[in-house]
A protein has these predicted regions:
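Solvent-exposed interaction patches of small proteins and small membrane subunits
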Residues: 1-158
Length: 158
């Protein structure tokens, strides 16, 4: 998809690649939903569940990072962000997501999957809150990115 900003040369954004990653993001959020209740007792008795949660959260982070890098580099004309946390700020500057979502998906304490790793060892009862925040954040991310793609359709100028 070719888009342009006022006064800027058109840039190319690979809409199909973004949409493909969004499909995987949606599936990963559904996988988190399917795990059900994630209380401390369950995580202590079933360590595999904690590992699965951490892996799905890492996948969500990686996919969003790839989308954010691609769109921000194309739209902003800057070097792509080097970290997932920085990529959410760049995605916000590119108009892909709003500032509130950018902040929610780049927690100050670290990425959701890293927080889960730490909490599994020390405070497993905190895992559910981290997963809930990530699940709602990535669900909203999919919604906003889908909206951006729709608004940036080939027949529309961004």
């Amino acid at each position: 998809m070719t888009t342009s900003r006022a006064g800027a040369a058109p840039v190319t954004v690979d809409r199909a690649a973004i949409e493909h990653r969004l499909i995987t993001l949606r599936k990963a959020v559904v996988q988190l939903d399917s795990l059900g209740r994630l209380d401390g007792a369950r995580l202590a008795n079933d360590p595999g569940t904690g590992l699965a949660v951490e892996r799905v959260l890492a996948l969500l982070n990686d996919l969003a990072f790839a989308i954010n890098r691609h769109v921000s580099a194309g739209v902003l004309g800057e070097a792509p962000p080097r970290t997932p946390a920085a990529s959410f700020g760049a995605a916000e500057r590119a108009g892909l997501i709003d500032a509130e979502l950018a902040a929610a998906l780049a927690p100050a304490d670290g990425p959701h999957h890293v927080l889960v790793q730490l909490y599994l060892d020390a405070e497993p009862e905190e895992v559910a809150a981290v997963v809930s925040a990530a699940r709602s954040g990535y669900r909203e991310y999919v919604r906003q990115v889908t909206g951006w793609i729709t608004a940036s359709a080939p027949d529309r100028v961004v």
